[in-house]
Structure formats: C-alpha cells, structure tokens
C-alpha cells in the first residue's frame, strides 16, 4: 500500500472524530505544560515569588520527570486510540484514560518505553543513523503489545524488528511526508499541531494495520503448510 493511500485511510478514519482527536491532543498539551506550571507556582509560594525566582527549583525538575514517566501509558494509549479509529471502532476520551485502571499494563508500557529508549540511545552512541534505523525498527512495539498483551517487552521489540524488515524506508518516507504540514503549523504558533498530530498518528496506525498485521496471517499460513 502506498503512503498516499495510508494517509487517505487515516483521513477517512478521522472523519466525524476530529473533535475527539483534537480535544485529546489539547488535554495532553494542558497536562504536560499547565500542570507542572501550576505546581511550580504553588510550591514557590505564589505567582509573585515564582516570577521573581532566577532558577527552577530542583523539586520542580523532579516533578516534571515523574510526570513524564507517569504520562507514558497515556501517550501510548493515544496511539491505540488511533488504531481503533483505523479499525473503524468508536473510541472516546475516557477509554484512553482507562489505561490507568490496568496497573500491570501501565507499568509494562513504562518499562517498554524506557527499555526502547535505552536500546536506541546505545545504538546512537555508534552513530546517529544507526540510532534512527533502530528507532524505526522498534516502532511497532506498542501496537504489538496492544494486539498481543501476552508478549514480553523483549518479545515485542524482537517482533517489531522482524516485521519491519523491508519497510523501514517506507516508514521513514511516510514521516517525511508530514514535514510540509509541520512547517505550516509553525505559522499557526503550534495550534495546527492539534490537528496534524492526530493525522500523522492515525497514518502510523494505518501503516501498522495494513502492512504489519497481515504478516501475522502469512506466518500462520507458513506454519500450517
């Protein structure tokens, strides 16, 4: 399937769901930026004290780090939201936040994200390009964990690497195809990202659903033979 077809499928999947997708992005933006700011202002003793301080308190940096880790399951759950859209489901915002009701899965996703980051970092120590290649190779890990919750983190990484053989360049070009839209978003002071991110995210989900999932059926047929 061509990249243009994946993008058309993404737009079709978002039809009637743009409001939910944009609202979800806005919520994530507010949680990421506004919540740490509010905590920092309150912890500083008020807006005037916060405004006058010259350096960011250490505890504020610690809070931001903890928050970033805590938001990993939510960020991944949003990618699953896009996958449900591609599969013609009817996901809503509460369904995305429901990931935190499953503590085991949440901690598994945090561990998977950290381990993936470590692997990519280690490859990047060699050169930047190997790091990029490996990040693409591991890119299907979280979708695979959704469809195969029985996978361990390492099994998901290995399976992602296996299924991305021959597809890395297409995946890379698919992301490059959004650069023009990204530049245009700069002229909207970033507001356009509220629409661009769901569009790109749903296209990535379509990539998985159309090019990665079918490999499983092919593997099953080989086993039967």
Which residues does each predicted region cover?
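Hydrophobic alpha-helical membrane segments
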Residues: 1-225
